[in-house]
Amino acid sequence: MDKENLYQEFVALMGEEHVFLEEPMKKHTSFKIGGPADLLVMPRTVEEIRQSVEICKKSKTPYFVMGNGSNLLVRDKGMRCVVIKIAENFNEVRFEGNHVIVQTGILLSTLSNQIARACLKGFEFANGIPGTVGGAITMNAGAYGGEMKDVVKSCKVLNHQGEIIDLSLEELELDYRTSIIQEKGYIALEVVLALQEGKYEEIRSIIDDLTVKRTTKQPLHLPCAGSVFKRPPGYFAGKLIQDCNLKGFKIGGAQVSELHSGFIVNIDNASAADVLNLIAHIQKQVKEKFDVGLHNEVRVVGEV
C-alpha cells in the first residue's frame, strides 16, 4: 500500500481533517483497544463514501467499513487497510409523517431521543444500544423485546458494483444478529423507519425505564463492546458464564464484568490479546461444563 499517495487522494476528496495516517484504533472503539490502522477516513456524504470505496478498489487496497466501533475488537497489531468510518459526519435525519429517513452514521441513542421528541413510538428499545444505525441494521441489533426488523421499512445500500440500491424489509433478510447486508458485504447508507404516533410522556417513560435497567445491569461505565457472545439456543450466555464461576475472572487488563457476566470489560489498559485469551478461556469452560458452544457477537478484526 502506497500510504502517502492514498493519503493525498483522500485529502483531495474530503479534506485533511477527515483523513488520518497510522490512526490508533483504540480511539475509535468502545473497548478502547486496538493497534493503528494504516489509514482511517471519515466521509460526510454518500458520494464521499462511494468514492472512498472506488479509490481503494482502483489501488487494490483492502478496506474495512465501521460505525462507531461499539461491537469491535481490533487486534494489537492494528489494521493493514483503509478504515472507512461512517459515524458522526454522516448523521442527517428527516421526518415524513410516521416515517423517519436517517443516514446510517447517527447514534441509536441520539436518533431515539429525536424520534421521542417527534412523538413517534416503536424505537424506544434502541435508546441504550451503543452503536450507529448502520451497525444496527447490518446486524439486526435489538434489546428488551425489540429489534431493527420490527421498525425498518427499507434501506439504501452501496453494492460491490458501486451502485446504490434500495432493499425492502424482506430483501434485507433480517434475522438474529445478521442480515443480507452483513452476508454480502454491502454498505448501509440510509434507513427508512416506519413508526406509530404516540404520546411523548409515555414514550419518554419507556425510555427512562429501559435506561435504569441498562445502567443497573450492564457495565456501561467501563470500556466494553456490549454482549461478547450471541445467545445460544435455549440458554443465556451470561448465566452459563456465571455458573462457571467466572464472574470477575481476569486475564491481564480484561475482566468478566462483575455486573453482567455476558460482558468483558477493559479495567486496566487491556490488550486485544488479553480479551481474546479471556474469550477462549470462557468458551472452553462453558463447553466443558455444559457442552454448549459460545459464538462471538463481538467482531474481531486486524492483523494476527
From Swiss-Prot:
Query: FAD-binding PCMH-type domain spans which residues?
Result: 33-198
Sorted alphabetically, the Gene Ontology cellular component annotations on this record are:
cytosol
Output the PROSITE patterns linked to this UniProt entry: FAD_PCMH
For this protein, the record's Gene3D superfamilies field holds: 3.30.465.10, UDP-N-acetylenolpyruvoylglucosamine reductase, C-terminal domain, Uridine Diphospho-n-acetylenolpyruvylglucosamine Reductase, domain 2
Q: What is its EC number?
A: 1.3.1.98
Pathways involved: Cell wall biogenesis; peptidoglycan biosynthesis
**Mind telling me which InterPro entries this protein's record contains?**
FAD-bd_PCMH, FAD-bd_PCMH-like_sf, FAD-bd_PCMH_sub1, FAD-bd_PCMH_sub2, MurB, MurB_C, MurB_C_sf, Oxid_FAD_bind_N
UniProt GO molecular function:
FAD binding; UDP-N-acetylmuramate dehydrogenase activity
**Catalytic site:** R177, S227 (proton donor), E297
Q: Which UniProt keywords apply?
A: Cell cycle, Cell division, Cell shape, Cell wall biogenesis/degradation, Cytoplasm, FAD, Flavoprotein, NADP, Oxidoreductase, Peptidoglycan synthesis
Listed under GO biological process in this entry are:
cell division; cell wall organization; peptidoglycan biosynthetic process; regulation of cell shape
What is known about what this protein does? Answer: Cell wall formation.
Q: What is this protein called?
A: UDP-N-acetylenolpyruvoylglucosamine reductase
Q: Which organism is it from?
A: Alkaliphilus metalliredigens (strain QYMF)
